């Protein structure tokens, strides 16, 4: 019987691959038989090499290329290297991005104190750090009229959240771009090209740990507020995203495009 969810033998390219989420995701796809390409900043090389060693020890296949998702010339070199190694790209995970603490109005500030330059930088990283890799890596998908692009949006794109103003604006733009690109690619290049996004809820990561936990590991008031509004009553775990990602990457979702899939333990759906 054919396995609709299979990604075996597929070439999966992931930007932002060396963070907590990225590490979990690339290991999952490698376990499923995909050939995984880790793209991240040069400073993450040691982490990447550790991940690759883990993957290869389990019989998987993976490689690392340092990148800068805001530098098209670097991305073009990545594309050349990937094509030389594997000859194709089947699945693109645009996960590079993140919040910037200065890109919001702090509790002791007003909107008139907003650091506009920080908001611009946050938007550039999250939005254009999604657009530019797509412009480069989707070329082979267009040529073969087949491929799945999965962008990383966020819960903060769905409703305005305090302390992440710039990040929320940027991720809302990623969601909008996802829907736009769905039509742009399918109409001009065929229905084998799909573009979707995942909008994760609250997970503890290196980026938000200081905001959500105290130095002793206990939860901050912000965390308690979040969990009170989450029907699951807990933070998500990184491995709770991989099933949705595999569905979007595989033929099981071949008629799904332009969709932002929310994985948040019910946060967005819950009301008092």
Label for each model-derived stretch:
Residues 3-37:
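Canonical Rossmann dinucleotide-binding motif of NAD(H)/NADP(H)-dependent dehydrogenases/reductases
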Residues 98, 112-131, 146, 150, ...:
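Catalytic Tyr-X3-Lys loop
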Residues 34-49:
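Conserved glycine-rich Rossmann-like NAD(P)H-binding loop of the short-chain dehydrogenase/reductase
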Residues 2-3, 159, 232, 245-246, ...:
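Short C-terminal tail/terminal secondary-structure segment
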Residues 154:
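Residue(s) in the substrate-gating loop at a strand-loop-helix junction
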Residues 77-84, 103-124:
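Active-site Tyr-X3-Lys motif and surrounding loop/helix of classical short-chain dehydrogenase/reductase
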Residues 189, 194, 256-258:
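Short, small/polar-rich loop/turn modules that mediate ligand/substrate recognition or access, typified
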Residues 134, 170, 178:
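Active-site helix of classical SDR
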